Amino acid sequence: MNDSPVLVVGLGNPGPKYVGTRHNIGFEVVEELVGRNYANFSVHKRSNTEIAQLPGLIVAKPRSFMNLSGTPIRALCDFFKISPANVLVVHDELDLDFGQVKLRQGGGDHGHNGLKSTSRSLGTKDYWKLSVGIGRPPGRMDPATFVLKPFSKQEQDSVPIMAADAADLIEEHIRTL
């Protein structure tokens, strides 16, 4: 790892309307990561994010909507002088079964508008992505509707475990940089 910190960003939508929705699993994961380190988020006005600073690590939640996440992520990279190679974005993934997590560097956005925005703003797809599986919508439900719905009662019981597993993977990954 170089001298710049690692930036871990959880994607989600701001506001109480979106708490507990599938699209906000990125927020759940970074909240777990920050909470287990006894830290708190505070507003970082220059980037329109909430951040928590840990040793060698900045954890962030954009305060913009998911599809506009790239702008605040780029602002954090510029402010803290972080290269895209030291960025890890946590996002929901329809193409992974519920509860599965997958870490990859580079690659496509899989149709995820938050990742599209991030890639556009960073000028590269060569950053780390942690996909957290939310599964496919049932029947003919529109995926855009599905991701904005709350987790089912049964799924809600698994979300804290899922967030903890993803946070474990982030911590393990950071140790290897």
UniProtKB/Swiss-Prot annotation:
Xref: CDD domains: PTH
Any GO BP: rescue of stalled ribosome
Top-level taxonomic group: Bacteria
UniProt site (Discriminates between blocked and unblocked aminoacyl-tRNA): N13
Localization per Swiss-Prot or TrEMBL: Cytoplasm
Gene Ontology annotations for the cellular component aspect, listed alphabetically: cytoplasm
Quaternary structure note: Monomer.
Protein name: Peptidyl-tRNA hydrolase
Upper lineage: Bacteria, Bacillati, Actinomycetota, Actinomycetes, Mycobacteriales
Gene behind the chain: pth
